[in-house]
């Protein structure tokens, strides 16, 4: 019996952020009917931290995003064409000065980008992709926010 990996398996690497503004609100995006955190796939020649900052800035129309620290990694699989994609996403705590206006990257299917009060993040994380709860908990462990 052949134990080689299936030719229909695609392995992807991505990075994203739990981004706080000066009001300690968290940046969330609404994409394909779900709340999500900004993230995206690693491009050739860039580091994982560079990818995280680039994706946050591109998806939300920001500049000057500061990477603070690594938070966690999440892994999930999903169908992609006639294959199965397994994506590892590297998450980072990030900060941005002020409370900048956001411009969602509509070409990526992002309909909204919003600063969400931290008190509402636990609810949001519980209504969307299960891996986002892991990111939320890692952010709280890192001291990114205080939850009552």
Spell out what each predicted region is:
Residues 1-16:
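Acidic, metal-coordinating catalytic segment for phosphate/diphosphate chemistry
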Residues 21:
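Short, acidic, Ser/Thr-enriched surface-loop or helix-capping motifs
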Residues 31-32:
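C-terminal lobe/hinge of AMP-binding adenylation domains
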Residues 42-129:
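Unchanged
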Residues 126-148:
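Charged phosphate-binding loop/patch that engages nucleotide di/tri-phosphates or the phosphate backbone
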């Amino acid at each position: 019996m052949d134990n080689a990996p299936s030719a229909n398996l695609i392995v992807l690497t991505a990075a994203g952020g739990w981004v706080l503004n000066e009001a300690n609100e968290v940046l969330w995006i609404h994409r394909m009917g779900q709340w999500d955190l900004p993230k995206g796939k690693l491009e050739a020649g860039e580091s994982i931290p560079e990818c995280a900052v680039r994706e946050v800035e591109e998806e939300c129309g920001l500049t000057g995003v500061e990477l603070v620290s690594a938070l966690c990694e999440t892994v999930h699989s999903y169908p992609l064409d006639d294959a199965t994609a397994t994506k590892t996403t590297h998450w980072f705590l990030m900060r941005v000065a002020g409370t900048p206006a956001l411009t969602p990257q509509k070409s990526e299917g992002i309909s909204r980008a919003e600063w969400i009060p931290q008190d509402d993040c636990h609810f949001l994380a519980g209504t969307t992709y299960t891996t986002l709860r892991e990111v939320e908990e890692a952010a709280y462990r890192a001291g990114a926010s205080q939850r009552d």
